[in-house]
Amino acid sequence: MPFKNNKHLLHLVPHGINSDVFRPLSSSEKIVKEKKKQLFGDKEYDFVLFYNSRNVQRKKTSNTILAFRAFCDNLTPEQASKCVLVLHTEKTQDAGTDLPAVKTALCPNYDVVFIEHKITPEEMCAMYNIATATILISSNEGFGLSIAESIMCGTPVIVNVTGGLQDQIGQTDDNGNPITFDLNFGTNNTAKYRNHGVWAKPIWPCVRTIQGSIPTPYIFDDVCTWEETAEAIMYWYLMSPEDRKKCGLEGRRWAMNEGGINSKNMCNQFIKAMDYTINNFIPSSPFDLYTLNDYVGNNQPHNSIGVEIPKIDTDKIKSEIKLTVAKL
């Protein structure tokens, strides 16, 4: 965190999920039965993959549909007929695409259910409990609320390792300690550390680029492949229901404790932040003089950009040049 006069200026207050609303439910509960009936009628599915997010390009919804198709192609027709992808999102969106058209073109032979209308938190909890796994493979994501809600409900998740999604999968370093991010190591998208919680199946991006806009000049855009996403779906499919449940419940335990993504911790952190601010408040002067050099803007402190710059193997490149020149 930045410091001024040896006092930090920022205090992180993480997202917090209400564990009384988002919780594990029995399949026999009325609301679960009703939501199943609304979604599937009388059809029973063995595997339900749930996507709960917006239809915008960075969410990679089309990639999710194609990955689901690739997953189903690796099953027998009978097995695939008992799998369904549930998309709680807009069918069409200018910032995204025409998802029904994508489904028709890329996944015509398998079941995909769309939910466009808003539903209550209680109904959403039922949805997570109906799901076998929840998926979100955004290429950049501030947090990923649906993943946190799913974890709190005890439902396993599939995520792309980027942005705030990586904060929800219990990553640890080689010594088993939670990963510490700083100005030089701001993301684990390079898979420097591959340890993670059992409730998550992470996918490490294979393409890392820079995106940006006027209000957000730059942000890392990390893209994972639909092929590896299909493998991640298969991971949860092949695991026994009993083991999946154990993995999911470990995720809820983590979220309620060291993970900290629960509403109680969010409120406590907010109280601490307010107390610290009040106790360490530094009144502003009536006026101050600033030069252009005082304005930091979007410059990163100490020329850090949040990622480790790799060392280029010049000897390897020189060897490649020699091989090319030898052909002349």
Task: Please provide the spans of the model-predicted regions.
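Conserved donor-binding/catalytic core segment of Leloir-type glycosyltransferases
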Residues: 41-59, 65-68, 85
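Conserved active-site histidine-acidic residue motif and adjacent donor-binding/catalytic loop
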Residues: 29-35, 109-131, 163
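Short hydrophobic beta-strand element within catalytic cores of glycosyltransferases
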Residues: 156-159, 169-170, 176-186
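Nucleotide-activated donor-binding/catalytic signature segment of Leloir-type glycosyltransferases, i.e.
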Residues: 91, 96-122, 175
